[in-house]
UniProtKB/Swiss-Prot annotation:
Region (Disordered): 1-122, 262-324
Regions recorded as binding DNA: 105-117
Biased composition (Low complexity): 24-33, 280-297
Record comment regarding domains: The PPC domain mediates interactions between AHL proteins.
Keywords: DNA-binding, Nucleus, Transcription, Transcription regulation
Domain of life, per lineage: Eukaryota
One Gene Ontology cellular component annotation held by this UniProt entry: nucleus
Function, in words: Transcription factor that specifically binds AT-rich DNA sequences related to the nuclear matrix attachment regions (MARs).
Signal peptide, first to last residue: none
Protein name: AT-hook motif nuclear-localized protein 24
């Protein structure tokens, strides 16, 4: 007969050893020991009523230490029991999960990259239609100053306002102001002259020719000063620097204003004024639209939308101006 079988038939094998049951049994024994010790100390302190203040203080300290030990054991047993349950569950359910389970704690604080990123600055790449651009124009030796600025205005399709200029010019033809009956005399100056003052404006076509003009004041070599409106070429004797500003919009206003346009609505604050009636305001708006639709009106935009007829100075104004 097999000795193993004979031994198994006589007595059963002992149950397997579990670390969990051993730890729980050890913790229970420790708790019972400390509870028994605490009960004995409490009975001794209740029976001893003749102790001094020092004895009472020592007894109180012993009580506090005992209660702290009991609380620590209870906390440790609870935390260890949780750990044992967690690991035990992972071992028992390992067939279903196939690995060890680890507790993951969510990190505190904001996740990386979640801060408010700085916004890019707002950059306006297109200028306003009413903006003025400043230009420093340098005109070379022997070039016509008037023709150079007029070509710049025509190619860029922008109005140019000449504010000042420095340099020397030669062979100037100007119209000097005359008396009231005569329009003035045209004078041709030969030689080299220094620019004292230079001003004027240039508008691209089809703007009226009267809107374009240039005035200059010159100083001669002997101290004489002459000036007037330039009616011919203005040749540069060396480099000439012109300070100018360009614009794309221009509101054309014809002065003096008509009587309907001069009437402005009165704000009724004291009770004596009266506002214009709606029919009168409608007639005024219609009159302004008719004036702008004619050949004498210059629309605000100069970029090819101007439709004006080239006229001479005598026939430009449809009606004569009233004397000032």
């Amino acid at each position: 007969m097999d000795p193993v079988q004979s031994h198994g038939s006589q007595s059963s094998l002992p149950p397997p050893f579990h670390a969990r049951d051993f730890q729980l049994h050890l913790q229970q024994q420790q708790q019972e020991f400390f509870l028994h010790h605490h009960q004995q100390q409490r009975n001794q302190t209740d029976g001893d009523q003749q102790g001094g203040s020092g004895g009472n203080r020592q007894i109180k300290m012993d009580r506090e230490e005992t209660s702290d030990n009991i609380d620590n054991i209870a906390n440790n047993s609870g935390s260890e029991g949780k750990d044992i349950d967690i690991h035990g569950g992972s071992g028992e359910g390992g067939g279903g999960s196939g690995g060890d389970h680890q507790m993951t704690r969510r990190p505190r604080g904001r996740p990386a990259g979640s801060k408010n990123k700085p916004k890019p600055p707002i950059i306006i790449t297109r200028d306003s239609a009413n903006a003025l651009r400043t230009h420093v124009m340098e005109i070379g030796d022997g070039c016509d100053l008037v023709e150079s600025v007029a070509t710049f205005a025509r190619r860029r399709q922008r109005g140019v306002c000449v504010m000042s200029g420095t340099g020397n010019v030669t062979n100037v033809t100007i119209r000097q102001p005359g008396s009231h009956p005569s329009p003035g005399s045209v004078v041709s100056l030969h030689g080299r002259f220094e620019i004292l003052s230079l001003s004027g404006s240039f508008l691209p076509p089809p703007a009226p020719p009267t809107a374009t003009g240039l005035s200059v004041y010159l100083a001669g070599g002997q101290g004489q000063v002459v000036g007037g409106s330039v009616v011919g070429p203005l040749l540069c004797a060396g480099p000439v620097v012109v300070m100018a500003a360009s614009f794309s919009n221009a509101a054309y206003e014809r002065l003096p204003l008509e009587e309907d346009e001069m009437q402005t609505p009165v704000h009724g604050g004291g009770g004596g004024g009266s506002l214009e009636s709606p029919p009168m305001m409608g007639q005024q708006l219609q009159h302004q639209q008719q004036a702008m639709s004619g050949h004498q009106g210059l629309p605000p935009n100069l970029l090819g939308s101007v439709q004006l007829q080239q006229q001479h100075d005598q026939s430009y104004w449809s009606t004569g101006r009233p004397p000032y």
